[in-house]
Amino acid sequence: MKKIVLLLTLCSIGVCASAGIMIYPKYLSLDDKTKSAEVTLINSSALESSNYRVTLSYKKQNPDGSYTEVTNEEEIPADSVTKILRYSPRSVMLKPSKSQTVRVLKRIPEGLEPGDYVGYITFTEVLLEKAATKENLDPKAFSVKLTPIPSFSIPIFVRYKVKENAHVSLETKGLVTKEGITSLSVVMKRQEQAKSKGPRLVARGDLSVWDGDQMIGYIKGRYMLPATDTLETQMPLYIPDAITNKEGQKENKYLTADELKGKTLKVLFTQANDEQLQKDKVLAQTEIKL
């Protein structure tokens, strides 16, 4: 039997692609006072075990917000964490209803420039091959089998000898309606010149859209990597918990372009906070009249 097996990697950033696997925290952050951090994987399945290979990687952030993994070592930029972090174990076996921790250790090489360093810790499931059967040993048969490989990543931020934040500005490109959802296109631009001296920093915070005192859009934990100068974000516009469904549960009411016509909206990029939006700690802002 002639069999072609295509391995498709289902990879997401911060979101597990394999059902039954949970991860905590959703990102790692190390500063001058922090030498190590831990990631915990939990197998919520009571029946199946899972095996994962653990790697450090660098992903290029594209202007549209997507990511491209850089596999050629010569193309990995200087702001990557891959050369300043160590981790163990390199593989994880998760038994049913069990958890395991991966420890990340920071080792600063001599002469490292101050700045923000970023990367991703990636967990890729190791699929076990099934034993061959009489049917699939038929030399005259031919088939193509697509095998998805569950994989997921979380970002790692390492800040070395810097305290200031990256300076960014915000611009808007108007409304975009796709698949029935109206969004506001927001562009974040870095203020530091790409060739200027000094460290390139991560811009990290929360994005929100306001119609007067009513928040109608929110993206928590938006960040622009040091090598990125322009980052566009599509922000769905809605009124939180404005509708009660038949089951008595609150749902968001998504706004249409007609409902927003003539309104002046304010966009805020505020200091990141794990608990709640800090509207009083504004890093950048802009307005748009629709």
Question: Which ranges hold each PLM region?
Answer:
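Sec-dependent N-terminal signal peptides
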Residues: 3-17
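Short, solvent-exposed loop/turn segments enriched in Ser/Thr/Gly
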Residues: 31-38, 101, 113-120, 180-184
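Terminal connector regions
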Residues: 57-59, 107-161, 243-290
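Short edge beta-strand/loop segments characteristic of extracellular beta-sandwich folds
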Residues: 38-42, 185-195
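Short beta-strand segments of immunoglobulin-like
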Residues: 24-30, 91-92, 171-177
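N-terminal edge beta-strand
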Residues: 18-37
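Short acidic, flexible loop segments centered on an aromatic residue
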Residues: 48, 52-79, 189, 193-215
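Intrinsically disordered, low-complexity Pro/Gly/Ser/Thr-rich segments with frequent PxxP/GP/PP motifs
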Residues: 73-110, 213-257
